[in-house]
Amino acid sequence: MDQARISFFPDGLRVMIIDDDAKAVRRATATLSQLQYAVVATHSTASAGLRALSGDNVVEIQAILCDVHKVVSSGFDFRRVVESELRIPVIYLLSKMEEEDMVAGEDAEFLNHLLLTATYIVRKPLNPTVMARLWRVVAWRMYCLEERIQANVAANAGAGGEDDDDDDDVVIVEEPQVHFKVVRRTSGGSRKRQLTINVVDDGNRGSGSGGGGGGGADANPTRILQHITSNLQEFRTKHQKKDMAIERPLISSDSMFLKAILPTLKISPCNPLILTGGIGSSSVAAEAFAGGSSSAAPLQIPVFQQQSTGNGNTVISFSNNASPMAMRAPTDNTMISFNNVSAAPVANAVISFSNISRSAAMQAPAARGQHLSGDVQQLDFPQQKLYFGPFSYQGPPPPSMHNHINLLPPTSSPVTCSMDKGKVPIIELPYGMPVDDFLVGQTAYGGAGLSIGATDAAATAYPYTDAPSNNVATGCLMVPRMGPAFSITEPTVVAQGEGIGTGVDAGTSEKNAIVEAPNNPAPLMVLDQVAADAAMDVEEDIMFSLESLLGPDYDLLPMEDVSAPDTAAAGDAAGGSLDGEEGGMDIGWDLDLDDILVENVNDFAFLDNLAGSE
């Protein structure tokens, strides 16, 4: 044990005693001397001991034994001040208190605080066995104080040198080229901290804060400002590029509508709207007309190739693969052929644009093995899905459209519905509607017209107005009927007149002309049913009998001609009668229509019967 104590305190443990009881001080000094603890100073108050420790003639002291009641009377925490500032452990001495020595109020609270935060407490009188282990307590506390002080210095340096006790302290961290200094303004309402970073060379560290430190302080903020400015400029550049990518306006090549209508427009290759250097291989048909060369030529328009023949015809071929294809152009007309192996085939799908006034249908060449001019052989290729319009949703056509589709000749004025004697009407519809959308009750120009809400087997008119034909927006697509002609039931038409005894059919000539129409009508015709409906719509004075309106399921009461004489006399006076002279129907009851209630069960209930039942 002595060897361990000597290793920590080779000159012995040097102790200061603070107590106003002289007898207790002498007794404590004798006990400590036996344990080889040297008592170097004694003081009666804590303030006197603190002044002695802070003076110039201070002696080396390694531990302080202080009566806790003297600390209470001093009014400050003696242990905290000495241990934090002088790094000397303080051990409190606690004596048995008499009634007159008891404290109360704030002193009692302060005493409890001192005892709770004390490093070590020893009761008086001193026990030699307890005091023999005192050197261990002192050695451990000295080590803790050294470590705590170093930790506090490092923490203050990391936080920028902030010190709670003194605002004007300067903490210098021994690191190369960096000095931290905190300046706090006490004048004014708000206190602001100013951090200055001084860059000092190793060669000028001992020369003071003269010219070297000032020059570094002046140059460093400029460097920091340049660094921040460059980062901000890079940040702005990145965001500007991102905004430009998001807000990039659509160019002409991005529009699917332009890509679809460019083949139908006569634009020179130098037009900026047309993309040069198209993708894929060139059209084999164009190569064949050019001389049969198999070398790939650059495309002026990426979706089609256009070539004029010697006879004034134009062939426009669409091709998405490299297989050879050539179409023979009909005489004095223009043919558009499609070639895409991924599309569904359509039998004999030909779109013809007539540049002349005739309305004859264009037919595809029947022979598949014929040779064109320049020894170009026409080859078979998969039939193509046909689109009506520039957008993909306007196709494919329904089964009733698997026929030749022709364009009408130009008309001088928009006609909603026109019909000649013995011919079916021609209906003109607006362009831009999908194929599967049918108009009901409205025509191309907003007026009431024919009903086109029929099924595939019924009449259907597909809009294709505004098609380019000599720069005139004309034409509509019509489908011939696919089934037998229909006829409507002959209506009973009754008109007032003299000498007429039976009903007259106003639409007999039109109906007969429709029924006698051939089974294979010419193009640009609709079904007979639609024509008959159109003929009936133009009539204004059409009347039906009550039996035709009610139908055969109604059970009418037996009619009695009880008022025939009166009705005949009234008819002679008025110039005619519907029941007497014209042979019309007779009403067998004298009740008004307001006296009859028509129920959902198709029965007639009279008001008199209802009143009697009630």
Swiss-Prot record:
Presence of keyword Transcription: no
Listed SUPFAM superfamilies: CheY-like (SSF52172)
Stored InterPro entries: ARR-like, CheY-like_superfamily, Sig_transdc_resp-reg_receiver
One of the GO BP terms on file: cytokinin-activated signaling pathway
Region called Disordered, residue ranges: 193-220
Keywords: Activator, Cytokinin signaling pathway, Phosphoprotein, Two-component regulatory system
4-aspartylphosphate modified-residue sites: 67
Family: Belongs to the ARR family. Type-B subfamily.
Name of the protein described by the UniProt record: Two-component response regulator ORR33
Taxonomic source organism: Oryza sativa subsp. indica (Rice)
Classification lineage: Eukaryota, Viridiplantae, Streptophyta, Embryophyta, Tracheophyta
